Amino acid sequence: MSNKLTFQEIILTLQQYWNDQGCMLMQAYDNEKGAGTMSPYTFLRAIGPEPWNAAYVEPSRRPADGRYGENPNRLYQHHQFQVVMKPSPSNIQELYLQSLERLGIDPLEHDIRFVEDNWENPSTGSAGLGWEVWLDGMEITQFTYFQQVGGLATSPVTAEVTYGLERLASYIQEVDSVYDIEWAPGVKYGEIFLQPEYEHSKYSFEVSNQDMLLENFEIFEKEAERALAQGLVHPAYDYVLKCSHTFNLLDARGAVSVTERAGYIARIRHLARSVAKTFVAERKKLGFPLLDDASRVALLAED
């Protein structure tokens, strides 16, 4: 195993590669979320006219997927490596395949397939054309061209590449269980994450206080609305993320019915859309500072 990339070396390799392609290297956003797409570095920056190229690792929590550390491939928390490029480069798929080569995976020697899988996130009002990337029969990446984010049409189109780091590392290191992945020399994934995985699963399915979570959802929703009323986009979005994670905990606990579930998702979606619209308005007031001068003048002159 010593001659194979460790988990952290995979991250470092991807960071260096996408840095070379002009991406800013961001840090994981400090709020619970179910996917890297929900980070403000993707959700907010994918809308509006300004360019944005970023890459970051995002720990992603999905309470309903917890399995007490007993399932070798299904986790309460996993890690995504997220790349967002706006406008989408015409050669984004080629860039992706080159990133696999950097990891020691030669596309000419492996069965790499792009399987159509259009993406939708009802709770944030987001959707796009998408493909799963399968490497020798195992999904390792999700490719998406955003068409709508927060209920707003995207222009220009943002390309998102989401690597599933645990799956990628399992393949590279040739192990059957994520807990056998070598995170760093001499340190296994399970030695870091197995106990937290068990504890979070037990909490999500058995211990969480449903009444408290229901109350928290109401509080977070009202606080998001209050922040938005003051034009405070980023604090409001933090509370949208808190609403989303709280709902996921309630869902894992079986505390919401099918009908109630749709209602909660609609409430989160309403907040996310309000945040998206307010964010674009905020950037416009600032004069879309990330645009080049000619584009900014032309765009603002249209209004």
Curated annotation (Swiss-Prot):
Q: What is its EC number?
A: 6.1.1.14
What lineage, starting at the top, does this entry show? Bacteria, Bacillati, Bacillota, Bacilli, Lactobacillales
- Quaternary structure per UniProt? Tetramer of two alpha and two beta subunits.
Q: Which GO terms describe its molecular function?
A: ATP binding; catalytic activity, acting on a protein; glycine-tRNA ligase activity; transferase activity
Determine if Protein biosynthesis is one of this entry's keywords: yes
| Protein name (database record) | Glycine--tRNA ligase alpha subunit
Q: Which UniProt keywords apply?
A: Aminoacyl-tRNA synthetase, ATP-binding, Cytoplasm, Ligase, Nucleotide-binding, Protein biosynthesis
What InterPro entries does this protein's entry cite? aa-tRNA-synth_II/BPL/LPL, Gly-tRNA-synth_heterodimer, Gly-tRNA_ligase_asu
HAMAP family reported for this sequence: Gly_tRNA_synth_alpha
One record GO biological process: glycyl-tRNA aminoacylation
The entry assigns this protein to a family as follows: Belongs to the class-II aminoacyl-tRNA synthetase family.
Please give the organism.
Streptococcus equi subsp. equi (strain 4047)
Checking PROSITE patterns in the record gives: AA_TRNA_LIGASE_II_GLYAB
Reactions that this protein is recorded to catalyse = tRNA(Gly) + glycine + ATP = glycyl-tRNA(Gly) + AMP + diphosphate
Cellular localisation:
Cytoplasm
**What's in the GO CC field?**
cytosol
